[in-house]
């Protein structure tokens, strides 16, 4: 069954490639609907106790101007997310809903060590119990695994099971091999694959994983090979999205301060290729898929 679905995606990609030059020449208008930013960091260097270079009012105004109506906020440390969640007047004025995730990183050292540190699991439990001013945490992550074998470790296993037991979404920056290992710990978990494989997993492999794991979704920031001429989707990716319109999300990945001045252009880039999709598919990827993850909050 999975093989058949992958073959169908391949045939659709071939048909789209034939008409690619015509499609680029007749681009549709940019998508104008709401956006859900499913991968946003508000790290310490951005806000720095509200006196940093990008205070809450600044970043929320960037979201408002970009038509972003909801965000998955996850930050190093979690104080950044709680700062945004606590800015209730400003988020209301900007029309932005903050969906808070628990990040595993208290500091930069945790990026490379969280999967061998039992105190991380306790920290996640404590944060979950406390919640935020915007309500309970709705997910865990983003976390990184640069060696997929670490996805099979005890800390990763406990976190995946904790997420599934508490209906939390997981945001993971991992390769395709780690997707299999993480899902083996908790087959019912909802997992967002950050960047849909930043290492550039082939489209065929992405299609296989989507077919294998119905609760897996792909987030598309930094995804190699996603767009081609005119900022439109490359044929294979367009085919995959048309075949799986409910499985993709967009994100800014503001992992470094240099991403904040680019925020509006990043969202404009998404609007460009979303505009080349059928209207219902564009709205699902741009907004509805993210909102559905967190209903009835949105």
PLM region descriptions:
Residues 41, 76-77, 103-107, 143-146, ...:
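Active-site beta-loop-alpha junctions enriched in small/polar residues
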Residues 6, 11, 27-38, 47-77, ...:
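Mid-to-C-terminal alpha-helical segments outside catalytic/metal-binding sites
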Residues 11-23:
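Bacterial N-terminal signal peptides
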Residues 30, 84-169, 217, 224-225:
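Active-site gating/metal-coordination segments in enzymes
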Residues 60-65, 85-98, 126-136, 164, ...:
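Acidic (Asp/Glu)-rich catalytic clusters
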Residues 40-55, 110-119, 228:
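Acidic/histidine-rich helix-loop elements
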Residues 36-40, 71-73, 98-103, 140-141, ...:
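Hydrophobic faces of well-ordered beta-strands that scaffold small-molecule active sites
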Residues 149-250, 297:
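Catalytic pocket-lining loop regions of alpha/beta-barrel enzymes
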């Amino acid at each position: 069954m999975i093989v058949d679905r992958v073959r169908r995606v391949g045939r659709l990609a071939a048909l789209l490639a034939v008409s690619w030059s015509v499609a680029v020449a007749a681009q549709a208008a940019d998508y104008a609907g709401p956006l859900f930013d499913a991968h946003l960091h508000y790290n310490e260097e951005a806000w720095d106790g509200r006196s940093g270079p990008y205070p809450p009012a600044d970043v929320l105004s960037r979201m408002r101007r970009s038509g972003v109506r909801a965000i998955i906020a996850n930050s190093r440390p979690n104080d950044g997310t709680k700062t945004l969640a606590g800015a209730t007047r400003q988020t209301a004025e900007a029309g932005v809903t903050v969906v808070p995730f628990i990040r595993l990183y208290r500091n930069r050292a945790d990026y490379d060590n969280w999967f061998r540190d039992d105190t991380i699991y306790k920290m996640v439990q404590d944060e979950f119990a406390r919640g935020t001013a915007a309500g309970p945490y709705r997910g865990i992550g983003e976390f990184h695994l640069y060696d997929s074998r670490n996805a099979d470790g005890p800390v990763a296993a406990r976190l995946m099971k904790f997420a599934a037991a508490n209906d939390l979404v997981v945001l993971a920056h991992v390769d395709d091999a780690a997707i299999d290992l993480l899902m083996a710990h908790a087959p019912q978990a909802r997992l967002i694959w950050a960047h849909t494989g930043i290492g550039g997993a082939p489209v065929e492999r992405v299609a296989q994983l989507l077919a294998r794991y119905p609760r897996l979704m792909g987030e598309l920031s930094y995804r190699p090979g996603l767009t081609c001429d005119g900022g439109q989707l490359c044929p294979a990716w367009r085919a995959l999205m048309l075949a799986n319109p409910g499985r993709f999300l967009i994100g800014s990945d503001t992992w470094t301060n240099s991403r904040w001045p680019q925020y509006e252009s990043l969202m404009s880039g998404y609007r460009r290729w979303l505009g080349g999709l059928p209207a219902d598919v564009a709205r699902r990827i741009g907004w509805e898929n993210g909102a559905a993850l967190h209903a009835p909050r949105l």
